[in-house]
Design a protein with these regions (language model features):
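Gly/Thr-rich phosphate-binding beta-strand-loop-beta motif of the actin/hexokinase/Hsp70
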Residues: 2-24, 110, 142
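Short glycine-rich, Thr/Ser-proximal phosphate-binding strand/loop in the N-terminal lobe
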Residues: 15-41
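Low-complexity, acidic/Ser/Thr- and charged residue-rich accessory regions of DNA metabolism proteins
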Residues: 269, 307-346
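Acidic, metal-coordinating catalytic cores used for nucleic-acid/nucleotide bond scission
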Residues: 61-73, 99
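Short, basic/hydrophobic alpha-helical segments
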Residues: 39-61
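Short alpha-helix plus adjacent loop in nuclease-associated cores
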Residues: 84-121, 134, 176, 270-280
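Phosphate-backbone recognition surface of nucleic-acid-processing proteins
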Residues: 223-226, 232, 237-317
Length: 346
């Protein structure tokens, strides 16, 4: 909402320059500005807008899309403006959107949606939530790098040698790789890869120790850890990607956010529910939940539903169905601050 005394600053934020669409709601005057993306220039712009708004008793409304840098901008000007973060991915695309794209068009679209009262908003996590998510994402990045190194070593052995590739990542297997007779060049490259693997493991230990410290002070993570198949790392990771449960009006909203809601088509009296899975906002959350299904499906609370779903739809769809049930349980646990019940029917 806005008043006819306010000044709207609709922003297309970039690393070097920022496009501004300035709208004075009192006079109807609109102007376009382009300023360097620096702390001083942004403060100068806001102070100028604030002075004009104060003369008529209005406020400055800063509207920008959810992009890298929004957190530092909000910290810089949050006390001087009403800060609004737009979710442009949920905005409807105009017919020629794929042919015409510019900063001028982008700021115009965002401003138009805001004035119409239909601007979709993005969640603005606090500094603590952002730190926890970075911790989780750092671990995921290290795991992916570790997988890349292991795949390289496996591919090298498969391509150049006839050695047995089973059990390579045990202490015995790593000792075997270090003693493997190779040419001087290949020996050097393999040693580099093994050193990289060891460094990644040390970094993983540091990150997981930091996650353990967060876990020790987080009762919600400890409750989620009580679910069979979900350990400390997975509990922290799931909660970091969910964020405050108050974001979601219902369990179905959480399921949709994770990309596990069925597609839906309706026209007149015709309704059609499509495939489960896909879509959603947080693919990492979906991955974490699905990966835990190997053990979660055996919990008495879900076992009967899983067995029925396997007989009717197959194992993969059955796991998605149980993943939806798990998310409903997590929503209940976090929303009502209750512990997980392994027996009660979901």
């Amino acid at each position: 909402m806005y008043r006819n005394k306010d000044i709207l600053l609709t922003v297309d934020y970039h690393a070097k320059n920022t496009e501004i669409r300035w709208l004075d709601c009192h006079t109807g005057e609109e102007r376009r500005l382009n300023i360097p993306t620096t702390r001083e220039e942004i403060l100068r712009l806001v102070e100028k807008a604030q002075a004009e708004a104060d003369r008529v008793g209005g406020e400055v409304i800063w509207i920008m899309e959810s992009t890298t840098g929004w957190a530092r901008v909000r910290e810089l000007i949050g006390s001087r403006t009403r800060f609004i973060l737009a979710n442009v991915l949920q905005m409807p695309l105009p017919p020629k959107a794929y042919r015409r794209k510019s900063d001028k068009i982008d700021t115009g679209r965002i401003q138009r949606e805001f004035l119409n009262g239909s601007l979709p908003l993005s969640y603005q996590p606090t500094a603590w939530w952002r730190e926890v998510r970075r911790l989780v994402d750092s671990r995921q990045d290290l795991v992916e790098r570790q997988t890349v190194v292991k795949n390289w070593i496996t591919h090298f052995l498969h391509h150049e040698t006839w050695v047995n590739r089973s059990g390579l990542w045990t202490q015995k297997g790593l000792a075997y790789l270090r003693a493997l007779q190779l040419s001087e060049s290949d020996r050097m490259v393999l040693d580099i890869k093994l050193q990289e693997l060891e460094q990644i493991r040390e970094l993983l230990s540091q990150v997981e120790a930091a996650m353990q410290a967060v876990y020790n002070q987080w009762p919600e993570a400890q409750r989620v850890d009580e679910v069979r198949g979900i350990g400390m790392v997975t509990a922290i990771s799931i909660l970091a990607h969910i964020g405050p449960i108050e974001r979601f009006a219902s369990a179905e909203a959480l399921i949709s956010y994770a990309g596990l809601a069925p597609a839906h088509r309706q026209s007149d009296k015709t309704h059609h529910n499509g495939q489960i899975g896909g879509g959603g906002t947080d693919s990492h959350l979906r991955y974490l939940v699905i990966e835990s299904m190997q053990w979660v499906c055996q919990i008495p609370r879900y076992r009967e539903a899983f067995t029925r779903a396997v007989a009717k739809h197959g194992t993969n769809i059955a796991r998605i169905i149980v993943a939806r049930m798990l998310l409903r349980s997590l929503f209940k646990m976090l929303h009502d601050q209750v512990r997980f019940n392994q027996v009660c029917v979901a």
